Design a protein with these regions (language model features):
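N-acyltransferase acceptor-side catalytic subdomain
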Residues: 1-171
């Protein structure tokens, strides 16, 4: 659930999640109730293993935080989010800062002027991040030394980790 994703982001072992105190936690939950904050969750059977959350405003999504309990599951969440935003006609995904982790997916730094232009353009849109959607796939595989694929870290006995967007209460 949305609350579970924020709680996981807030309890990250590194210090990046420490900014999410009780007041901020409840504020984001209120935004979720109002239909403005959303999460993407990665599940292995009934266990939440990764995810992210952010806030939408018209044609922009402002990513706030992400977490993973199983290697690469935050990457699965990010890829699912980008696909969802593209399908929904969103024009801006604000990641706050570009890390090597995000750069591998095509994230780039842009100038303040370009950001403000893209933000203004995205405010002219009326995009919706409605309803739950899910994606179920086969096991997540890692290449072995010979270049083939043979292991499935974090996959369930069914071999099908899944990603889904949680609906807001308004959806």
């Amino acid at each position: 659930s949305f609350r579970d994703v924020i709680a996981a982001c807030a309890s990250k072992e590194d210090t990046r999640g420490n900014w999410i105190d009780d007041e901020i936690f409840e504020s984001y939950c209120a935004l979720h109730q109002a239909g403005h904050a959303h999460s993407v969750e990665v599940w292995d059977e009934d266990r939440l293993v990764g995810g992210l959350y952010g806030v939408t405003l018209r044609g922009a999504f402002f990513g706030e935080s992400m977490f993973h309990r199983v290697k690469d599951t935050s990457k699965v969440a990010l890829c699912f989010l980008v696909d969802r935003l593209c399908d929904g006609g969103y024009q801006l995904l604000d990641l706050q800062w570009v890390t090597p982790h995000l750069r591998q997916f095509g994230a780039v730094d842009i100038s303040r002027a370009r950001y403000l232009t893209q933000l203004a353009e995205s405010m002219q849109l009326d995009c919706r991040f409605d309803g739950p959607r899910s994606l179920r796939g086969g096991p997540v595989r890692e290449p072995n030394r010979s270049g083939g694929r043979d292991s499935a870290p974090g996959s369930s006995s069914s071999g099908a980790p899944s990603a889904r967007c949680a609906p807001s209460s308004r959806s």
